[in-house]
Amino acid sequence: GYIREKEKATVLVLGLGNADVTADALGPDVVKNIEINRHYAKEAGIQVAVAGLAPGVMAQTGMETAELVRGVVRQLKPDVLIAIDSLAARDSSRLNTTIQLSSQGIHPGSGVGNHRVGITEDVVGVPVLAIGVPTVVDAPTIVNDTMENFLKAIAQSKELKSVSRIFSEYSPREKYELIREVISPEMVNMYVTCLLYTSPSPRDQRGS
């Protein structure tokens, strides 16, 4: 509905994340691999002009990503912003297997406790569609998933069934917090990443 009713429209694709960190490079990789055409859309009679931006992370720029995006949006005046980012999973099975879609924007870094200003319509001034893919999982989640499988296994045993019953009374959140408390401090904030395969971009293939 954002661009369907317009004869011509501009879309800004925002690739969030650190291109130098494999599991956080999803956003920049998407921008690298999409067809950017805004610079010749008018001459070519293209209906939807696509621009791309990979602003990096605050540690690289010293600026909030939202500040950079707001400045670009003010100049570019896109009809809609599509933000792509890596997410932290709360279930190991979701790594690289699920996609989260939202029309409410996105808050970079929130999945790993690194809270930054959100990329939302209220902040940047245009509608924001967010696409997220889980690419990292923390150590407590891996331990929790392992424990869940272990408890399912011992539930089949008459002698150990009572142990499984005790833990079944805990909610998933309570189990996760319990594991965070007993796991070593060095492991609590450790994240495991998935390798993302990156194919040559259209621009690389054209040699430009």
Map each language-model feature to its residues.
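Glycine-rich phosphate-binding loop
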Residues: 66-117
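Extended, charged alpha/beta regions that create polyanion-binding interfaces
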Residues: 1-9
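Long, charge-rich alpha-helical interaction segments
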Residues: 148-185
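Glycine-rich phosphate/diphosphate-binding loop of Rossmann-like nucleotide-binding domains
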Residues: 18-46
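Short glycine-rich or small-residue beta-strand-to-loop segments that form or flank ligand, phosphate
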Residues: 10-20, 52-56
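Gly/Ser/Thr-rich active-site loops/lids in small-molecule metabolic enzymes
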Residues: 32-35, 98-123, 155-162
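A structural-propensity feature for long, helix-poor, extended segments
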Residues: 50-72
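Conserved small/polar residues in nucleotide/adenosyl-binding loops
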Residues: 197-202
